[in-house]
Amino acid sequence: AFSLDRVKAAYVAIMNFAPLYVAIGRDFMKEQNIEVDMQKVASGTEAMAFLAQGTLDVGGVGITAATFNAFHKGFDLRIVASAALQPRKGGPTVIIVRKALKDSGKVKSIADLKGRKVAIAGGPGTTGAYFVAKALKEAGLTIKDIEMVNLANPDMRLAFEKGAIDAALVGPPYSDQIIGGGKGVLLAQDMAPGAMTTVFMYSGKLMKERPEVAKRFMIALIKGSRAIQGKKYLDSANLKAYLKYVTSTENAIRRGRPQLFDPDLKVYMDSIKNMEEIFREASWTNYTTAIPQERMVDLSYAEQALKVLGPFKP
């Protein structure tokens, strides 16, 4: 009998990796003669460890300081495609400040957060910390100018109510609850418009030992992204695919704002460079010299896939 090529994929159960869910659910992988063995992991850091060891082939990963530390150590893996991108404007992640500070005029802008307590879920080196560090840099400050508090998102509302924090980086539904509760107001939004904060990676083993499979996987993955553009995002076949892998409800997905994906899953190099630079300047990486692009990224699979698929037609 004809057997399918098996590819083991690590994923964190969030909508950022929707093209993969759809590529499987709508049989684009099967069309490419691939069977995907999905392995749920707790974090991108965990996924990268498996990829570096070659025990898993593909991973959906959020970029953090740990990502760059792994590349610096020479981990055998590469970014091959973008996953969800930050919106160009009206992004869900915002910086909220205590209403009393805004009302009194003590905090009018990001620059006024100097010396103040700012809560970020997960603390230093996270994607959230990147947003805050980038906003501070643009205001002429560094992350060292604030007191960072590592606080889980659900705990932030109470911290605002008690006056235990001055500001926080937070997203829905918590941001809406804090503002709705009257103790916090919006200070900044769209700190990194269009940023590529989540990516798909291949293991060195897959690239070296099965380059053909890696290329076919990419064809299916890009088809998955193209199938969820614009209004198609909520097609019933897509919803069914999302719900197989994400802990959510159809209602919540319909109500929530759609994640943004490049139809070609293009890798945004300037985005990677900017994140790496900000993480380095904040001393969240354990090295000081920029990592060469070819040690982090391999664009050849997407390029080959696009030759087969042709340009995206909305």
Regions found by a protein language model. Name each.
Residues 17, 21, 48, 64-67, ...:
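Extracytoplasmic/secreted envelope proteins and their assembly/folding machinery
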Residues 154-244:
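Pocket-lining segment of extracytoplasmic ligand-binding domains
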Residues 25, 52, 56, 72, ...:
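Sec-exported extracytoplasmic/periplasmic mature domains
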